[in-house]
From Swiss-Prot:
Organism: Bos taurus (Bovine)
Catalysed reactions, as listed in the record: ATP + H2O = ADP + phosphate + H(+)
InterPro entries the record matches: Chap_CCT_eta, Chaperone_TCP-1, Chaperonin_TCP-1_CS, Cpn60/GroEL/TCP-1, GroEL-like_apical_dom_sf, GROEL-like_equatorial_sf, TCP-1-like_intermed_sf, TCP-1_chaperonin
GO biological-process terms attached to the record: binding of sperm to zona pellucida; chaperone mediated protein folding independent of cofactor; positive regulation of telomere maintenance via telomerase; protein folding; protein stabilization
Protein name (record): T-complex protein 1 subunit eta
Xref: NCBIfam families: chap_CCT_eta, thermosome_alpha, thermosome_beta
Superkingdom of the source species: Eukaryota
Presence of the UniProt keyword Nucleotide-binding in the record: yes
Gene that encodes it: CCT7
Length: 543
């Protein structure tokens, strides 16, 4: 008699296990890699992505592209996550890390199909990654921090390598210098949020400028603003979160008055409350008043009469950066405005940049800060420029903290590939095949660089293998001559951290996907499955 089957999972649950689902997961990761494959390197193409709301984004950055893709496959999401983590940790190498993870999986796919146990693959990969990381640390070149000129040269080269694959690669020398200047202005903590990037449409890219201090766009202002001075030396700055404006009652207030005098007394009281606040600000000695909330026309004219400058509705992040740079603290009341809570800077001025007016605070005593003002044409182009600069800034920060570099352009990957191939020949058994597969997967980076530039990849890789076998460990792809070259001599440098991070993240992701032996998808509940488009605010579900 047949035993009764035990039904454990809900009806409609999709469960797949064994080798077929593992192969399916590997194939899904290949599809993700295909999406960013062509963006790698200085001859990489850009992607134009339009989201559900019709907003267009042009980008070459692997992490940005993967964020904008609406990936639903659970295994493929892992690759999106490692690209995001690489972006957050080191800023560059996001496309490389996705390609490496997908290529590791591609190389082990035949072994998986033949039934090799996933744990053997994982063990081999962990060994290979450890060997590769140790090799990078061993051959990386360290630049002495004491020699400031040399260190600066190193940082500029690293920034130029990061920018060479971006839309602004034509101006990479100009922006590399700007990025290094910006990071050098910061204090030892190198806080990323102390570098502000503001975009002003119009003008050429070369008109972009670096301001040693805080700069933000002039806020909306009321009549009387034009009377205020636009430049101060050594002013005191009041940072407020206070509304300086006469407004209608927020709540449904009800006041019963019997005579005109009663009504007048209420009106006078409202004015007196406002004037009382303004007087306290004036007596505090502040010359520049910034508030997160609106500053109305009465207050604007009051300050103008007393040679004071004010700006209301200042964005919170700009107010916080001003506070961190100039000192002082943001006050929610004007009753305790003493010199301790006021900020200071050497010069405050308002200047015209393109069609916009900007407020500048320079010579800030508390924290070193700076602002990059970008100029350019189309909005999408400027957004991509901002993303490119973010990557370059992250790379320069990493290079300052870890001052060892390796050659880019596929050189370090070819050297690691040769090293692991030689190592694999010294060990017996299945590990030999798997470490050999890992070594072959590393060649995807130089191969893809060649493919994206339209070169004959097989020919160039053969030349590279031969040169690395003869001991030319820094030889990589030379995009300009369609040949190979010593990329260390050509100053194609990257911080060693970028490569170490990319290898470990890609290897871990590959191991994670190989170790999954069953995928169970719960059915979507019937309520969720119904079209939710009609539900907005106040239109709940029908019960």
């Amino acid at each position: 008699m047949m035993p009764t089957p035990v039904i454990l999972l809900k009806e409609g649950t999709d469960s797949s296990q064994g080798i077929p689902q593992l192969v399916s997961n590997i194939s899904a990761c290949q599809v993700i890699a295909e999406a960013v494959r062509t963006t790698l390197g200085p001859r990489g193409m850009d992607k134009l992505i339009v989201d559900g709301r019709g907003k267009a984004t042009i980008s070459n950055d692997g992490a940005t592209i993967l964020k904008l893709l609406d990936v639903v496959h659970p295994a493929a999401k892992t690759l999106v996550d490692i690209a995001k983590s690489q972006d957050a940790e080191v800023g560059d190498g996001t496309t490389s890390v996705t390609l490496l993870a997908a290529e590791f999986l591609k190389q082990v796919k035949p072994y998986v199909e033949e039934g090799l146990h996933p744990q053997i693959i994982i063990r081999a990969f962990r060994t290979a990654t450890q060997l590769a990381v140790n090799k990078i640390k061993e051959i990386a070149v360290t630049v002495k921090k004491e020699d400031k000129v040399e260190q600066r040269k190193l940082l500029e080269k690293c920034a130029m390598t990061a920018l060479s694959s971006k839309l602004i690669s034509q101006q990479k020398a100009f922006f590399a210098k700007m990025v290094v200047d910006a990071v050098m202005m910061l204090d030892d903590l190198l806080q990323l949020k102390m570098i502000g990037i503001k975009k002003v449409q119009g003008g050429a890219l070369e008109e972009s400028q670096l301001v040693a201090g805080v700069a933000f766009k002039k806020t909306f202002s009321y009549a009387g603003f034009e009377m205020q001075p636009k430049k101060y030396h050594n002013p005191m700055i009041a940072l407020l979160n206070v509304e300086l404006e006469l407004k209608a009652e927020k709540d449904n207030a009800e006041i019963r008055v019997h005579t005109v005098e009663d009504y007048q007394a209420i009106v006078d009281a409202e004015w007196n409350i406002l004037y009382d606040k303004l007087e306290k600000i004036h007596h505090s000695g502040a010359k520049v008043v910034l508030s997160k909330l609106p500053i109305g026309d009465v207050a604007t004219q009051y300050f103008a009469d007393r040679d004071m400058f004010c700006a209301g509705r200042v964005p919170e992040e700009d107010l916080k950066r001003t506070m961190m740079a100039c000192g002082g603290s943001i006050q929610t009341s004007v009753n305790a405005l003493s010199s301790d809570v006021l900020g200071r800077c050497q010069v405050f001025e308002e200047t015209q940049i393109g069609g916009e007016r900007y407020n500048f605070f320079t010579g800030c005593p508390k924290a070193k800060t700076c602002t990059i003002i970008l100029r350019g044409g189309a909005e999408q182009f400027m957004e991509e420029t901002e993303r490119s600069l973010h990557d370059a800034i992250m790379i320069v920060r990493r290079a300052i903290k870890n001052d060892s570099v390796v050659a880019g352009g596929g050189a370090i990957e070819m050297e690691l590939s040769k090293y692991l191939r030689d190592y694999s020949r010294t060990i017996p058994g299945k590990q030999q095949l798997l470490i050999g597969a890992y070594a072959k997967a590393l060649e995807i980076i130089p191969r893809q660089l060649c493919d994206n530039a339209g070169f004959d990849a097989t020919n160039i890789l053969n030349k590279l293998r031969a040169r690395h076998a003869q001991g030319g460990m820094w030889y990589g792809v030379d995009i300009n001559t369609e040949d190979i070259a010593d990329n260390f001599e050509a100053f194609v440098w990257e911080p060693a951290m970028v490569r170490i991070n990319a290898l470990t993240a890609a290897s871990e992701a590959a191991c994670l996907i190989v170790s999954v032996d069953e995928t169970i998808k719960n059915p979507r509940s019937t309520v969720d499955a119904s079209p939710a488009a009609g539900r907005g605010r106040g239109r709940g579900r029908l019960h």
